[in-house]
């Protein structure tokens, strides 16, 4: 289970049974670091879970707990989706127009201006004053925000300024992940 894998990783014990898990943890950390260096950013928001009674009425709500094993699965799924998109683009005949890509466009001009206002309010210097805001700028801004409550608030504020991701027959890239090509070869990540 995710919980057992998370505990194994937290204990940092090496054995015949855990060596692969620890190796995968290091590999996915490296993938994430490279993804962020190339322009991906991470907006951490809480995922909420609900308990329901027999009539379907919510009785309790709580934040879904995640651990390192969830992050491993997330990075593996991102990589599988990226590689599947690259494979489709490189190996399928262009006349075969049933390739479906997951696209996430850059923010609209008005929302980019709103993000700039947030950056200016917190005296954040952009890498490029006149160019479009990059996903690297957003990542650096959130990384520089040390107050965790403020970071969550700013993450949600910026997330609301993003265009929604969509599916298309042509790839325009995935702004938030920093990928040129992306698809949903796996199930959407939020389900795990």
Role assignments for model-derived ranges:
Residues 1-192:
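Conserved, carboxylate-rich catalytic/transport cores that coordinate ions
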């Amino acid at each position: 289970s995710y919980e057992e894998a998370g505990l194994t990783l937290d204990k940092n014990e090496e054995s015949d049974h855990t060596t692969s898990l620890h190796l995968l943890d290091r590999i996915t950390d490296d993938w994430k670091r490279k993804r962020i260096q190339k322009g991906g950013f991470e907006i951490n928001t809480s995922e909420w879970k609900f308990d329901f009674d027999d009539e379907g009425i919510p009785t309790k709500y709580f934040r879904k707990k995640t651990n390192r094993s969830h992050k491993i699965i997330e990075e593996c799924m991102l990589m599988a989706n990226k590689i599947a998109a690259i494979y489709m683009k490189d190996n399928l005949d262009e006349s075969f127009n049933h390739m479906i890509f997951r696209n996430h466009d850059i923010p609209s001009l008005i929302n980019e201006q709103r993000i700039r206002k947030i950056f200016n309010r917190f005296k954040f210097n952009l890498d490029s004053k006149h160019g479009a805001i990059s996903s690297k700028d957003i990542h650096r801004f959130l990384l520089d925000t040390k107050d965790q409550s403020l970071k969550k608030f700013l993450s949600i504020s910026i997330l609301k300024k993003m265009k929604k991701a969509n599916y298309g027959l042509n790839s325009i890239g995935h702004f938030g992940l920093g990928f040129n090509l992306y698809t949903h070869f796996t199930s959407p990540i939020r389900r795990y």
